[in-house]
From Swiss-Prot:
One of its GO terms (cellular component) is small ribosomal subunit. Part of the 30S ribosomal subunit. Contacts protein S5. The interaction surface between S4 and S5 is involved in control of translational fidelity. Gene3D superfamilies: Ribosomal Protein S4 Delta 41, Chain A, domain 1 (1.10.1050.10), RNA-binding S4 domain (3.10.290.10). This is Small ribosomal subunit protein uS4. The lineage of its organism: Bacteria, Bacillati, Bacillota, Bacilli, Lactobacillales. It comes from the Bacteria.
Length: 203
């Protein structure tokens, strides 16, 4: 299944949240496209709620269904912890997401492009695979010539805070995954239990 390349604002309005994290998509109209106002939404079934939650998280991280499902299956093989929380933690450890969490990119999509175009180093070595799983203690940095990219400067200037599971050295422009993320440090808009229920019926 190919990755969706249409306008993200439509998906954001449909879900009622900002998928990019900027908030711009729903700042003017916080109701679904096609609705004639915020109070014109139909009731959603249990099936619909589960599907919506799955799509919400998948679209947040920009994965296709196969990538998303495979990661969910892998999370189920982790012995400790809850399946849904482990799944979200694996998503958080993707290289493109860590680049986003460090503030080197304004959105996950922008972070994915930085990785794809070879701007990102992991422990000093170039890694151009967005799905690369960052390990605790690994250092994330930019190639020297990439530190002057305007989009990187703009992203860093806009940083208000970073999640506590990462650290960042502003002078060196390097960051580290200092520990695994805890549930309350991950996406608060997501009910991962609904996603587990969805896949338990499908797999």
């Amino acid at each position: 299944m190919s990755r969706y390349t249409g306008p993200s604002w439509k998906r954001s309005r449909r879900l009622g949240i900002s998928l990019s994290g900027t908030g711009k998509e729903i700042s003017r109209r916080n109701y679904a496209p096609g609705d004639h106002g915020p109070n014109n939404r139909a009731k959603v079934s249990e099936y619909g709620q589960q599907l919506k939650e799955k799509q919400k998280l998948r679209w947040m991280f920009g994965l296709n269904e196969r990538q998303f499902q495979n990661l969910f299956i892998r999370a189920g093989k982790i012995r400790e912890g809850k399946h849904g929380v482990n799944f979200m933690a694996l998503l958080e450890r993707r290289l493109d997401n860590i680049v986003y969490r460090l503030g080197l990119a304004s959105t996950r999509e922008q972070a994915r492009q930085l990785v794809n175009h070879g701007h990102i180093l992991v422990d000093g070595k170039r890694v151009d695979i967005p799905s690369y799983e960052v390990k605790v203690g690994q250092e994330i940095s930019l190639r020297d010539k990439s530190k002057n990219l305007q989009q990187v400067k703009d992203a860093l200037d806009a940083v208000v805070s970073r999640p506590p599971f990462v650290s960042f050295d502003d002078s060196k422009m390097t960051g580290t995954l200092v520990r695994l993320p805890e549930r309350d440090e991950m996406e608060p808009e997501v009910d991962e239990a609904l996603i587990v229920e969805w896949y338990n019926k499908k797999l």
